Amino acid sequence: MAGTVLQVVESLGGWRLLDDGQPIFWFPERDSALETAKVMADARHQFDGKPTCVQAQDELGAFELVFAFG
């Protein structure tokens, strides 16, 4: 069963939320982007039962797993 990956990446002085690589939202603060991504990931997992995770860039630009559902 394929899952969904939401990613929070630095962009234009703020943070962009990517949905399977496609940009969907931009936030001025990282925490706002992470909270929105967490709610979206949890809702998707609740709705379709597929695994969903949130990854975010760290200070060096590498991705770290922040949340996982399913």
Outline where the language-model segments fall.
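A generic structural signal for ordered secondary structure
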Residues: G13-W15, T36, Q55
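Short, mixed-charge low-complexity intrinsically disordered segments
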Residues: Q46-G70
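Charged, amphipathic alpha-helical segments
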Residues: A2, E29-D42
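Short aromatic-glycine-(Arg/Gly/Cys) micro-motifs in beta-strand/loop hairpins
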Residues: M1-P23
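Generic marker of residues within folded, mature protein domains
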Residues: Q7, R44-Q46
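A short, exposed loop/beta-hairpin motif centered on an aromatic-Gly-Thr core
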Residues: D20-S32
